[in-house]
């Protein structure tokens, strides 16, 4: 889990993203797919589609909403070691089942702080806290075999 201070940095940097969660969720997925085009192929609704087609897809909002809400759960529980352990275990098992592994989340970790910064300037130290959160996810996926 993260320290209380790290969890606070996550919450402060996440709040502006979550305040406009629908548009920001869509924008995050598009930014991920632009930075890592193969990422779209891990989503059945987007496999083989162009960015323009994904943007126009009625499925974009439902997929991005699930991602934003799951991230919100991680942010809200980041300092609770017990809850995080259970959440990470469930998350990693689900994602291994989807064929998603640690490399895909290394990609997310590399671009997510920049995405957060594009919404609102985060407090100092927030990028490192996001890196640590995604590091926990990556470690859980590796432990689950991916």
Swiss-Prot record:
Ranges for domain Globin: 1-146
Molecular function via GO: heme binding; iron ion binding; oxidoreductase activity; oxygen binding; oxygen carrier activity
Pfam families: Globin
Signal peptide extent: none
Cell cycle in keyword set: no
PTM sites of type N-acetylserine: 1
One GO cellular component, as annotated: extracellular region
InterPro entries from the UniProt entry: Erythrocruorin, Globin, Globin-like_sf, Globin/Proto, Globin_lamprey/hagfish, Mb-like_M
CDD domains, per database record: Mb-like (cd01040)
Keyword Secreted on entry: no
Record-listed heme b binding positions: 95
Keywords: Acetylation, Heme, Iron, Metal-binding, Muscle protein, Oxygen transport, Transport
Other comments on record: This molluscan globin lacks one of the heme-binding histidine residues found in most other globins.
Protein family according to the UniProt entry: Belongs to the globin family.
Self-association state and partner proteins as the record states: Monomer.
Protein name in UniProt: Globin
Source species: Bursatella leachii (Ragged sea hare)
């Amino acid at each position: 889990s993260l320290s209380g201070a790290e969890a606070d940095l996550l919450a402060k940097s996440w709040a502006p993203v979550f305040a406009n969660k629908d548009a920001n969720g869509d924008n995050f997925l598009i930014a991920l797919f632009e930075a890592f085009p193969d990422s779209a192929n891990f989503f059945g609704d987007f496999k083989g589609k162009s960015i323009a087609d994904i943007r126009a897809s009625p499925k974009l909002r439902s997929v991005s909403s699930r991602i934003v809400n799951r991230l919100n759960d991680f942010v809200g529980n980041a300092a609770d070691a017990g809850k995080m352990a259970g959440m990470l275990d469930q998350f990693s098992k689900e994602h291994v089942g989807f064929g998603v592994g640690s490399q895909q989340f290394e990609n997310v970790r590399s671009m997510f702080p920049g995405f957060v910064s594009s919404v609102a300037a985060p407090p100092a130290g927030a990028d490192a806290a996001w890196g640590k959160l995604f590091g926990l996810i990556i470690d859980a996926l590796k432990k689950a075999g991916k």
